[in-house]
């Protein structure tokens, strides 16, 4: 599906609401312990911030963590985001021309749609086959684990 062919119903049908692979009843503390990480206030606050913002920038997380905890350094937030990403609790995405974003939806191989006008990002489920959704014509001996696809277009708000 190319952005030129998007319409309200096809776009709405492919966008997903952000979900985490952790059970709905799991607390941030449970999630951290389950990943073998120490439970710290900045880590808990960062998980909460990313969960609330879906595709949060580091600045979004910093603002939220500071609102919750008070003084926290920029470096501390970047360290937390790095640790949570390395542990597989967050996924870092980097749409071209946009700051890195963090999301809690991990463990699957979904893709993203980005509005060229306002930068809104939505999740798009893997549309064909099993992960990684795309089969390269030549894998050069690699074992392909994921494929990253970014759809670009205009969201409903920016089209009106």
Protein language model regions, located:
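Short, intrinsically disordered or compositionally biased N-terminal tails of bacterial proteins
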Residues: 1-23
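Short, Lys/Arg-enriched N-terminal segment that forms or immediately precedes the first helix
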Residues: 14, 23-36
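Short capping segments at the starts of secondary-structure elements
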Residues: 39-41, 52-57
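Pre-recognition alpha-helix immediately N-terminal to the DNA-recognition helix
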Residues: 44-49
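Short acidic, hydrophobic short linear motifs in intrinsically disordered regions
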Residues: 56-65
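Short coil turns linking two alpha-helices in DNA-binding domains
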Residues: 73-74
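Basic amphipathic alpha-helical segments that dock to polyanions
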Residues: 77-87
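Non-DNA-binding regulatory cores of transcription-related proteins
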Residues: 87-160
């Amino acid at each position: 599906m190319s952005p030129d062919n998007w319409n309200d119903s096809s776009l709405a049908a492919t966008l997903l609401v952000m979900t985490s692979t952790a059970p709905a009843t799991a607390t941030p503390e449970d999630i951290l312990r389950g990943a073998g990480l120490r439970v710290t206030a900045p880590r808990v606050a960062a998980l909460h911030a990313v969960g609330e913002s879906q595709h949060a920038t580091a600045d979004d997380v910093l603002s939220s963590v500071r609102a919750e905890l008070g003084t926290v350094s920029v470096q501390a937030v970047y360290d937390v985001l790095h640790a949570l990403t390395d542990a597989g609790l967050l996924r870092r995405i980097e749409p071209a021309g946009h700051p890195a974003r963090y999301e809690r939806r991990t463990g699957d191989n979904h893709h993203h749609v980005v509005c060229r006008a306002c930068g809104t990002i939505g999740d798009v489920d893997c549309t064909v086959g099993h992960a990684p959704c795309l089969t390269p014509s030549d894998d050069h001996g690699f074992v392909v684990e994921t494929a990253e696809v970014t759809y670009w277009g205009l969201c409903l708000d920016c089209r009106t």
